[in-house]
UniProtKB/Swiss-Prot annotation:
Subcellular location: Periplasm
Residues annotated as signal peptide: 1-24
Quaternary assembly: Monomer.
SUPFAM superfamilies registered for this protein in UniProt: Prokaryotic lipoproteins and lipoprotein localization factors (SSF89392)
GO cellular component, one term: outer membrane-bounded periplasmic space
Record's keyword terms, sorted: Chaperone, Periplasm, Protein transport, Signal, Transport
Protein name: Outer-membrane lipoprotein carrier protein
Source species of the chain: Cupriavidus necator (strain ATCC 17699 / DSM 428 / KCTC 22496 / NCIMB 10442 / H16 / Stanier 337)
Function (record text): Participates in the translocation of lipoproteins from the inner membrane to the outer membrane. Only forms a complex with a lipoprotein if the residue after the N-terminal Cys is not an aspartate (The Asp acts as a targeting signal to indicate that the lipoprotein should stay in the inner membrane).
Length: 211
């Protein structure tokens, strides 16, 4: 389930602090992010919630680390409860399942599209793929709501939360009313990265599947 969600989100979401004005509208803070944050690294926690509101039930929790350099380069690594790697070098997306010792390759252009990954790893042209508007403020977090313009995406609504100028969380809601919630800590924006930081090497003996 976790892998399906992240693959559908095209390697999913790597997040980071944004030093936007603390009281700016969420749309302004997002724009500061896409124009000012070219790379980042940090840690994430991901929760799967079945249902919404008070009736929502957490069905799974995972965590790990991320690093990215826009456009199209990122590493999203799960470390708990088990090890899985999603990595893109700007052209190809690699998904490595350590337990199966299996690598899946996908063309990156087709993977991003109207997914949440396009917000974080793609270009700055958000309005091409999303309807963007300010949402409510909850517990001090200002939310931005993005609705994909494409009709064939897995997520029908994407929420991005900011607090005191920093990216705090993302909510991905599917057509069945289930939510994937990501929260971010230890974020560093625009850190120095090695030239080969996103070069993927197939592990010894791994099976490779191309899609």
């Amino acid at each position: 389930m976790r892998n399906r969600i992240i693959v559908s989100a095209c390697a999913a979401l790597a997040m980071f602090a944004i030093q936007a004005p603390a009281h700016a509208a969420a749309t302004d803070q997002l724009q500061s992010f896409v124009t000012g944050v070219k790379s980042a690294r940090g840690e994430f926690t991901q929760r799967q919630v079945k249902g919404q509101g008070a009736n929502g039930k957490v069905t799974g929790t995972s965590s790990g680390t991320f690093v990215f350099s826009r456009p199209g380069k990122f590493t999203w690594r799960y470390t708990k409860p088990y090890d899985q790697l999603l990595q893109a070098d700007g052209q190809t997306l690699y998904i490595y399942d350590k337990d199966l010792n299996q690598v899946t390759e996908r063309k990156l252009d087709g993977a991003l599209g109207s997914s949440p990954a396009a917000i974080l790893f793609g270009s700055n042209d958000l309005e091409k793929n999303f309807v963007v508007k300010n949402g409510p403020t909850r517990d001090g977090v200002e939310w931005l709501e993005l609705t994909p313009k494409a009709k064939d995406t897995q997520f029908e609504r994407i929420g991005i939360g900011f607090k005191a100028g920093n990216l705090e969380a993302m909510e991905l809601r599917d057509a069945f009313g289930n939510t994937t919630l990501l929260t971010f800590t230890g974020m560093q924006k625009n850190p120095p990265l090695a030239a080969d930081a996103f070069r993927f090497t197939v592990p010894k003996g791994a099976d490779v599947m191309k899609q």
